[in-house]
């Protein structure tokens, strides 16, 4: 199984300079990058189509020259009512185009979630997602990009604090059901291991539920309470079960890390990343 890393994991040390991130990935021996377009410092929405194409084609060519490819991107996400706006829809369409310019196969997308204590029913939320993604399908087909719905959580205020709230799409059977309802060869799933652990779901079982619709991964550990984005074996996830699950469904994608910087010290963090990938290599042998 190939390994990769999210550009978000490197962004604090390179001021989100995508070319420097490629150099870092090469030094780490990583051959795949998950480009975080939701946090990009390049304004791909408000430049011309030609300019955006030139930028991401140049980035792709630089990556290829260094033995690296962009296996997936991450689209922007927002809250209600922003995701009902034409502006947000156009941003996602532009993200699909930029994903294509990078020659990346997949774009990770957060399902749309209505706010806590709203008057919306779950069925309305499901239909909202179906309608939104159906509007995207012509663009996904035109640019040959596959959308991967990620298992997510949301937030709510409790006793003056913002705390994690599990939602419909925190649970594997619900996410798979949504994908089945859309029923398109261009729509699949991204498994976020930390989010699944927060939902107290068995990740092996989740992988089996996702099965052939599991196309991309966000790999990180946690203790099941906070979204720690920690390296493997530093939380409570059973990584051998994760490996076995991926093998059992014949997963051939990228084992892509999405871990937070562990220190503000640049050299220390790069050393920590090297150690993180040693753990990955040991697991996947």
Residue spans for each PLM region:
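Residue-level detector of anion-binding/catalytic polar loops
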Residues: 31-32, 69, 105, 146, ...
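Conserved beta-strand positions in the central sheet of alpha/beta enzyme cores
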Residues: 34, 72, 108, 148, ...
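Short glycine-enriched, charge-decorated loop/helix-capping segments at active-site entrances
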Residues: 45-50, 123, 164-165, 229-233
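Active-site acidic/histidine proton-transfer and metal-coordination neighborhood
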Residues: 56-58, 62-66, 81-188, 198
């Amino acid at each position: 199984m190939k390994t990769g890393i999210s550009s978000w994991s490197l962004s604090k040390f390179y001021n989100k300079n995508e070319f420097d991130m490629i150099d870092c990935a090469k030094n780490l021996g990583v051959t795949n990058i998950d480009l975080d377009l939701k946090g990009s410092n390049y304004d791909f929405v408000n430049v011309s189509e030609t300019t955006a194409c030139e930028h991401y084609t140049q980035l792709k060519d630089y990556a290829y020259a260094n033995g690296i490819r962009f296996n997936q991107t991450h689209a922007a996400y927002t809250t209600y009512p922003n995701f009902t706006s034409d502006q947000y829809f156009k941003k996602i369409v532009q993200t699909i185009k930029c994903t294509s310019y990078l020659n990346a196969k997949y774009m990770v997308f957060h399902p749309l979630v209505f706010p806590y204590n709203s008057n919306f029913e779950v069925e309305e939320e499901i239909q909202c997602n179906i309608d939104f993604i159906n509007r995207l399908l012509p663009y996904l087909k035109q640019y040959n990009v596959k959308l991967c719905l990620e298992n997510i959580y949301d937030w709510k205020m409790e006793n003056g604090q913002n705390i994690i709230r599990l939602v419909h799409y925190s649970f594997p059977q619900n996410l798979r059901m949504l994908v089945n309802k859309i029923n398109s060869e261009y729509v699949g799933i991204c498994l976020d291991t930390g989010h699944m652990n927060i939902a107290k779901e068995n990740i092996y079982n989740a992988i089996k539920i996702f099965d052939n619709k599991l196309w991309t991964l966000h790999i990180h550990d946690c203790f099941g309470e906070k979204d720690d984005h920690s390296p493997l074996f530093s939380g409570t996830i059973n990584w051998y079960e994760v490996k076995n699950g991926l093998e059992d469904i014949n997963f051939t994608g990228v084992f892509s890390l999405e871990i937070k910087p562990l220190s503000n010290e640049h050299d220390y963090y790069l050393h920590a990343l090297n150690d993180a990938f040693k753990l990955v290599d040991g697991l996947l042998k």
